[in-house]
Regions:
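Mg2+-dependent endonuclease catalytic cores in nucleic-acid-processing enzymes, primarily RNase H-like
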Residues: 223, 227, 231, 238-240, ...
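Walker A/P-loop
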Residues: 62-84
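Conserved RecA-like ASCE ATPase "motif II neighborhood" in helicase/translocase motors
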Residues: 141-196
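ATPase catalytic-site recognition across NTP-hydrolyzing enzymes
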Residues: 252-325
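N-terminal accessory segments
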Residues: 1-65, 429
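Acidic two-metal-ion nuclease catalytic site recognized across multiple nuclease folds
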Residues: 3-7, 465-481
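Conserved nucleotide-state-sensing and coupling region of NTP-binding domains
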Residues: 101-158
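Two-metal-ion RNase H-like nuclease active-site motif
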Residues: 146, 153-155, 317-329
């Protein structure tokens, strides 16, 4: 090379060593040779955040917080955090150790392999082959080491990492959007992080945990961690596709959004593109995966403005009751829900609706007191969902009280379909709420469905509406499990 080219080469190499963002831009062609690089402000922000953590760990300074990053899909998050960052960090200090994880072993290994492809590329070897190399006897797709004890281990959510430790623990999309619909999958991912992955730092006060993901459910890993006291232990970076929801974190990032359109990356996520995504993903998918708000206010299947608030109760109307019993009083499960309503002239008035967490004896004692308080008469009926303790509740109340109690039928449709069946009655304004402190909790759960943590109040509403549409349990009845 000529002196001019040698100088340019040396300057580029030095610049890449000094700045992870510059390394990201220069290494792009190695992993995406057919895709032109399009950069945006969030790339530099995330790169700078990771670089600061890397340099702090090298200096052996205590950390302030672990990190949660929520960004839309197709925003280059995995290439930055899981593919390129470990490679750049090894240039700075090849003794660093990484454990990375994704929702599937296939994806996790694919990302790990891309990191290794950079290391094996001619572009990289010309610049940093003298800094480190991959050991031949420790060179698997899911685990490889360099000649300075640096290690990269790729695992998946639910996978074992026994005996492994790292300076960086990276979780990249712990759930796919499809998996997020399963409470079991969500619980498994959250418990795996809490009980297995969380403890894998070599130095708990210095090493860092990094979670980068699109939001897919209110109870996904981000929601699980940010909903507890543990939120104080995490720096939360939230970059939604638009600034519509006021969900940008930290607030200082708001200045990077287009002042006219409110878009975070107009070149890739234009208004037209976002409209197409909204059509394809639906309201809930769009709210979570693009807006990073998986429980959008008043944008779900049930809207707040469908419900009128009444100041007066229908005094002469018969009050009926719906009971959706919980499996246990465990805080993790849905609570038991009780709903009182009247039905006159094809219109429902919800008199009261409460959530209670009570074991069987306390619940059986509570029910008679609550229904009497809410207007029970000899003409009233109490319908109990037969799941969990439902059958036993019916039997006990019939045996020990004079209440008119009836066991209902099991559901025949999925949750979304059951709500869809009653949506016309709701949207037409035929269901009102008697003014009370319970209104806000009730409306909050309804408007967040189906992404809300609990759906027991929704369950009761569906049962109440269907009860009158199809007539005293003789027709079609739909409600929640």
């Amino acid at each position: 090379m000529t002196n001019k080219k040698l100088l340019k080469f040396a300057l580029e190499k030095k610049l890449c060593e000094m700045s992870f963002y510059e390394f990201f831009k220069k290494a792009w062609h190695v992993v995406e040779p057919a895709v032109p690089l399009s950069t945006n402000w969030h790339h530099k922000y995330i790169c700078d955040t990771l670089q600061a953590e890397c340099e702090r760990i090298i200096r052996q300074e205590p950390k302030t917080k672990d990190i949660i990053i929520n960004v839309p899909f197709r925003s280059t998050k995995s290439l930055i955090v899981t593919v390129m960052f470990p490679v750049w960090a090894w240039i700075k200090s090849p003794k660093l150790r990484f454990i990375t994880s994704s929702y599937s072993a296939t994806l996790s290994i694919e990302l790990s392999t891309k990191s290794r492809d950079i290391i094996f590329s001619d572009w990289f070897k010309k610049r940093w082959e003298d800094v480190f190399h991959i050991k031949k006897d420790q060179n698997l797709k899911e685990r490889y080491e360099n000649n300075h004890i640096g290690m990269r281990r790729a695992t998946s959510v639910g996978g074992t990492v026994t005996g492994q430790g790292g300076d960086f623990l990276i979780v990249d999309d712990p759930l796919s959007p499809q998996m997020a619909n399963s409470a079991t999958e969500r619980d498994n991912a959250n418990e795996w992080y809490r009980t297995t992955f969380y403890s894998r730092l070599n130095q708990a006060d210095i090493g860092v945990r990094i979670i980068i993901m699109q939001r897919v459910h209110e109870e996904d890993l981000s929601g699980f961690l940010l909903d507890k006291e543990t939120r104080l232990n995490y720096k939360h970076i939230c970059i939604p596709a638009t600034n519509d929801d006021g969900n940008i974190k930290p607030k200082s990032l708001e200045k990077f959004y287009n002042k006219e359109t409110g878009l975070f990356w107009e070149d890739r996520f234009s208004k037209k593109v976002l409209d197409d995504y909204k059509s394809a993903l639906g309201t809930y998918g769009y709210a979570g995966q693009l807006q990073q708000t998986p429980t959008p206010l008043d944008s779900g299947m049930i809207h707040r403005d469908w419900f009128r608030i009444d100041r007066h109760k229908r005094e002469e109307a018969k009050v009926n009751f719906i009971i959706d019993p919980a499996y246990t009083a465990n805080q993790k499960n849905d609570p038991s829900a009780l709903l009182a309503y009247t039905y006159v002239d094809n219109k429902w008035q919800i008199v009261d609706c409460v959530n209670v967490r009570k074991e069987f004896p306390e619940l059986v004692k509570f029910i008679p007191e609550w229904v009497q308080k809410n207007g029970y008469t000899n003409k009233s009926r109490i319908y109990v969902e037969p799941k969990a303790s439902g059958k036993s509740i019916v039997q006990t109340l019939i045996r020990e009280t004079g209440l008119n109690v009836k066991e209902d039928k099991p559901p025949t449709k999925d949750k979304v379909a059951r709500v869809s069946d009653i949506s016309a009655s709701l949207e037409s304004g035929r269901v009102s709420l008697l003014h009370g402190k319970w209104n806000e909790e009730f409306l909050d759960q309804l408007t967040k469905f189906p992404a809300a943590k609990h759906d027991d109040m929704v369950d009761c509403l569906v049962m109440a509406v269907n009860k009158e549409i199809w007539g005293n349990g003789k027709g079609k009845i739909v409600y929640f499990n």
